[in-house]
Design a protein with these regions (language model features):
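Short hydrophobic/aromatic-rich beta-strand segments that constitute the beta-sheet cores
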Residues: 83, 131, 165-167
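Exposed beta-sheet edge and beta->alpha loop/turn motif
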Residues: 127-161
Length: 173
């Protein structure tokens, strides 16, 4: 018993702490690293706040699309984005950027609008949000306006107050 107390006091002296200040588990006092401090998770947005946030992101992102500003548009996508398109297949960030640049070059008058009443927003716990809607693309072809609707699901990740798209599923073209 006496040797255990002696070892404890020796370890305590070597660790530079006092018995009153010792708040970490015994394992930490024996040389194990202390666990990292948890980063506080921001308070989740209310359902209405989340909806308004994603609706605003949709408006801003597609303003960049309609302006054919590829760099500004791609700022909304995470570097590790996976874009699944029913006609074009799976693309990564670079391929998606190249596809938008080609689209804007081939159809310089293309525009996108959100179909009114189609926007749905759902929280993704400890991650961000799902953004589901129907969109309408229009451009002039052979002297006439050509429009078509498609559907999409976007998964937005929120990190340090910044929202980025990590997954896109675009379908029903």
């Amino acid at each position: 018993m006496r040797s255990s107390l002696g070892i404890f006091l020796l370890l305590l002296a070597l660790s530079g702490t006092t018995a009153h200040a010792q708040t970490t588990p015994r394992k930490a006092a024996l040389g194990s690293p202390t666990p990292p401090t948890a980063v506080p998770v921001p308070k989740p947005l209310t359902k209405d706040e989340l909806y308004q946030t994603v609706a605003q992101l949709d408006t801003e992102m597609f303003a960049a699309f309609n302006a054919h500003d590829v760099n500004k548009l791609m700022a909304y996508f995470a570097d590790n984005v996976e874009f699944y398109h029913d006609k074009g297949g799976l693309t990564n960030f670079t391929q998606t950027k190249e596809a938008f640049a080609r689209l804007f070059a081939q159809s310089p008058d293309i525009t996108r609008t959100l179909v009114p009443g189609s926007l749905e927003v759902y929280p993704v716990k400890n991650y961000g949000a799902m953004h589901i809607a129907t969109q309408r693309f229009c451009h002039v072809e052979n002297g006439r306006e050509d429009c078509g609707n498609s559907k999409f699901v976007m998964v937005w990740q929120q990190q340090a107050g910044t929202w980025r798209i990590t997954r896109v599923v675009s379908y029903d073209h």
